[in-house]
């Protein structure tokens, strides 16, 4: 596996080859990331992974400085997966000048849910992803469904900018107890780790309640959301949201759409101690 930090060197290595299958990451790799590498390979070699902890998507009180950086272990994992190139730029490599141009997602998608509680987050995500796409010029790019809203936004960005890349979703990988794998799970104490699967259990309960409705309507969904939030809060979680939304655009469904069988997804974010976890479940 070649490890490259310079953009021009990356382009030189990729020139004349098939267009890559690309998996962007922030490192601290776990089985969820590695499953995305395998999915990328199914869409063709060479597979290019990137590791870059993107300052632009962290807020002033978030964990940029403490975000786990495990480069040597990550390299070993990627080598075992047969990744062709690891693109691991420094900030100076990727942002040689201040990044004054930013990609601002539309408010109806970028300022809701995660965007409401992490202002500027998706602006930072879209900016770095577009820049990485420019560097790698991939045929396909793989993003995990655990970050459901991010996947939707990147897909829409690629479509609106007519980028020649297909966005492939990767299924969420979970621990045996149901907790979605995440680099931030390492922040959890032993007691918090034992409690953390409750987040997925609550989503499963919400799903069962929605499927059990004889007639779906807006008021019924709001009541289910309210009770689920209360359930988490009663277990010492600090929920930011539990929201039942349309899969297509993450907007709340109308009564007419619900009665027509609009596909739905449940999305949540909640803090357990100092660790903020996100998860989702399609209906």
UniProtKB/Swiss-Prot annotation:
One of its GO terms (biological process) is pantothenate biosynthetic process. (R)-pantoate binds at residues 57, 150. The gene is panC. GO terms for molecular function: ATP binding; pantoate-beta-alanine ligase activity. It comes from Polynucleobacter asymbioticus (strain DSM 18221 / CIP 109841 / QLW-P1DMWA-1) (Polynucleobacter necessarius subsp. asymbioticus). Its EC number is 6.3.2.1. This is Pantothenate synthetase. Beta-alanine binds at residue 57. The keyword Coiled coil does not apply. ATP binds at residues 26-33, 144-147, 173, 181-184.
């Amino acid at each position: 596996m070649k490890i490259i930090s310079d953009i021009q060197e990356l382009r030189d290595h990729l020139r004349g080859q098939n267009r890559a299958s690309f998996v962007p990451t922030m490192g601290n790799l776990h089985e969820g990331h590695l499953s995305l590498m395998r999915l990328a390979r199914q869409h063709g070699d060479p597979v290019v992974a990137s590791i870059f902890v993107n300052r632009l998507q962290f807020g002033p009180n978030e964990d940029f400085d403490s975000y786990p950086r495990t480069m040597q272990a990550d390299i070993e994992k990627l080598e075992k997966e047969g990744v062709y190139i690891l693109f691991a730029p420094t900030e100076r490599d990727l942002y040689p000048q201040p990044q004054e141009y930013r990609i601002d997602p539309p408010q109806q998608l970028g300022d809701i849910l995660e965007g409401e509680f992490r202002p500027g987050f998706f602006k930072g995500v879209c900016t770095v992803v577009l820049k990485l796409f420019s560097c790698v010029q991939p045929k396909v790019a793989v993003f995990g469904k655990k970050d459901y809203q991010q996947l939707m936004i990147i897909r829409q960005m690629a479509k609106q900018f007519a980028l020649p890349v297909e966005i492939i979703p990767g299924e969420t990988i979970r621990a045996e107890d149901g907790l979605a794998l995440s680099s931030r799970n390492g922040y959890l104490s032993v007691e918090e780790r034992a409690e953390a699967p409750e987040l997925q259990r609550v989503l499963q309960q919400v799903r069962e309640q929605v499927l059990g409705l004889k007639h779906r309507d807006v008021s019924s969904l709001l009541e289910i959301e309210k009770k689920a939030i209360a359930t988490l809060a009663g277990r010492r979680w600090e929920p930011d949201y539990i929201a039942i939304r349309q899969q297509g655009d993450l907007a709340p469904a109308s009564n007419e759409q619900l009665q027509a069988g609009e596909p739905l997804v449940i999305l949540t974010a909640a803090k357990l101690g100092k660790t903020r976890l996100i998860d989702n479940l399609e209906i």
